[in-house]
Amino acid sequence: MRVITWNCGGGLRKKLDIIESFKADILVIQEAEDPALSTIAYRDWASNYLWVGTNKNKGIGVFSKYPLRSLNWNAEYSIAGIAHSKAKWKTSDLETFLPFECNGQVYLAVWTKSGGTDSAFSYIGQFWKFLQLHKADIKRNDCIILGDFNSNVRWDKHDAWWRHTEVVEELEQLKFGSLYHHQFNEAQGVESEPTFFHQYNLNKAYHIDYVFMPNHLLGT
C-alpha cells in the first residue's frame, strides 16, 4: 500500500494532476475542500472519500480506491487535581483528527490547529490532548498516525508538559516510532529534509509532518 499525506494548502481540486502522479492507494490531504460542497469534477474525482472540518474549504480529506470506514472515537478526559475548565476536554473539542480503517489497517489522519480559545494547547497541544483520550484505541489497533502536526521539537516551550518532546516520548512508551526518523536515522529536531516552506520561501524550511507507527511495522 502506498499512503501519502500532504497539506495541499487549499484548492486541492486545482492540484489533482500533481497528486495523481504519485499513484497512491490512500491519500490523506490537509486543507482539502469538502467534495460534497465543491465542483462536480472534484466530487467525481473524490468518489470514495471521508472528510471532516469546520470550514468547507479546508478540512482533512481521505481518498482511496479501497473501501474506507470512519471510526467513531469519542471520549472525555480530565486532569486529576486541577479544578479548571481547561483541564477537562472531549474528542469533539479538538482539531482536527479523522480515525479511519482501510483494508484492515487503522489510521489516524492529523491536522493540528491553533485550538481556538484553547490557545495554550495549540497545535501539538491538540494532539497531546487527543493522545490522552485515545491511547488505548491507538495501541489496540496498531494505528498508523500521519499528517501535519505543525510542530517540531525546536519549538518546545519550557513551561509546557505537552511539548513535542513529551508527545514523542509518550508514543515511544506505547512502542510507536517516527517513520522518517527511523528511515533516515536522524534525531528529532535535526531533520535534513523539510516538509514545509513557510510563505513558499526556501529559506523558511521546516519539518512539521510526521508518520508514527508501531515499532514492529518499522521493523524495530
Whereabouts are the PLM-identified features?
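Flexible loop residues that form catalytic
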Residues: 32, 184, 216
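Structured beta-strand-rich core segments of catalytic domains in phosphoester-bond hydrolases
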Residues: 32-113
